[in-house]
A protein has these predicted regions:
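Short, hydrophobic, well-ordered secondary-structure elements
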Residues: 15-16, 23-42
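Charged alpha-helical initiation segments
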Residues: 1-25, 112, 128
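Amphipathic, non-membrane alpha-helical segments in soluble helical-bundle scaffolds
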Residues: 1-5, 20, 24-28, 70-77, ...
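Amphipathic, well-ordered alpha-helical segments in soluble domains
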Residues: 11, 30, 34-37, 79-83, ...
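Short, conserved alpha-helical segments within structured domains
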Residues: 30-31, 56, 60, 102
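Alpha-helix C-capping/helix-to-loop hinge sites
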Residues: 18, 41, 67, 87-94
């Protein structure tokens, strides 16, 4: 993941530091921002170069809806955005969820992205039965 999205790693780690120093009003915003970099960097890595600028400028929800085909990534990333948005907006929609739920869903999103990348590499290395 650090190769795919170094900005994700940096932003996530800064959000974690904010959380550890009890800056609870800003750490969620950082986690939400890190998610945006993770998703967009992932999409940029799998799309043709002529689409990169479109992805950079598109709203995150639209990127997930329009550009992610893997149902697992799409499903968990959407929910991570929902919780991340609760950290940035005045009114929470998911009052029974907190920062730990957001981090857990980001971790799950990471898992599915890593699995897809590793599977793709395996299929490239072993395209067919011999």
């Amino acid at each position: 993941i650090s190769e795919l999205s170094p900005n994700f790693c940096e932003i996530y780690n800064q959000a974690y530091i904010a959380e550890q120093t009890n800056l609870m009003q800003i750490c969620g915003t950082g986690y939400r921002k890190s998610l945006e970099f993770l998703i967009k960097d992932y999409l940029i890595s799998i799309t043709p170069e002529d689409q990169h600028e479109t992805i950079r400028n598109k709203f995150l929800n639209n990127c997930i809806r329009d550009n992610i085909s893997n149902i697992n990534i799409k499903t968990v990333a959407s929910r991570a955005v929902w919780l991340g948005n609760d950290e940035t907006h005045y009114t929470r929609k998911w009052e029974d969820k907190d920062i730990n739920d957001l981090k857990s869903i980001i971790e799950l999103t990471l898992h599915w992205i890593e699995s897809e990348i590793r599977t793709q590499k395996l299929l490239e290395d072993m395209p067919e039965f011999r």
